[in-house]
């Protein structure tokens, strides 16, 4: 068997990792070993946070809806229950948007929810 030297492959792999670590602080962007660990960890954080982002936005929407509903003297849970009973199928993202940018429409939704309760 002929001897296989891995110079080209190793250099390509190192370049790929160092390119991914571009902008990292200190050795994390210059030393392959450290950069490799940093890139792996960054991937783990990115994977985790893509899932957390969905939860955090839902929390934000609920907080906004709750604040707007309480200004109309109704709690969040009663408001959502009223909307379900009134068969209003608007998701929390849109409700939060309405609560922030169109207070008149949100008040109308609250009145509709109150009338069913």
UniProtKB/Swiss-Prot annotation:
GO terms for biological process: ribosomal large subunit assembly; translation. The keyword Ligase does not apply. It comes from the Bacteria. Signal peptide: none annotated. One of its GO terms (cellular component) is ribosome. GO terms for molecular function: rRNA binding; structural constituent of ribosome. InterPro entries: Ribosomal_bL20, RIBOSOMAL_L20_CS, Ribosomal_protein_bL20_C. The keyword Ribosomal protein applies. Keywords: Ribonucleoprotein, Ribosomal protein, RNA-binding, rRNA-binding. Binds directly to 23S ribosomal RNA and is necessary for the in vitro assembly process of the 50S ribosomal subunit. It is not involved in the protein synthesizing functions of that subunit. NCBIfam families: rplT_bact. Belongs to the bacterial ribosomal protein bL20 family. This is Large ribosomal subunit protein bL20.
């Amino acid at each position: 068997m002929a001897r296989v030297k891995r110079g080209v492959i190793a250099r390509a792999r190192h370049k790929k990792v160092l390119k991914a670590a571009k902008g990292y602080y200190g050795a994390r962007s210059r030393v392959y070993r450290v950069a490799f660990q940093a890139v792996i960890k960054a991937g783990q954080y990115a994977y985790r946070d893509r899932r957390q982002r969905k939860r955090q936005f839902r929390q934000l929407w609920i907080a906004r809806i709750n604040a707007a509903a309480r200004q109309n003297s109704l709690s969040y849970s009663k408001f959502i229950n009223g909307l379900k009973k009134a068969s209003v199928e608007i998701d929390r993202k849109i409700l939060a948007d309405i609560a922030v940018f169109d207070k008149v429409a949100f008040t109308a939704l609250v009145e509709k929810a109150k009338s069913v309760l």
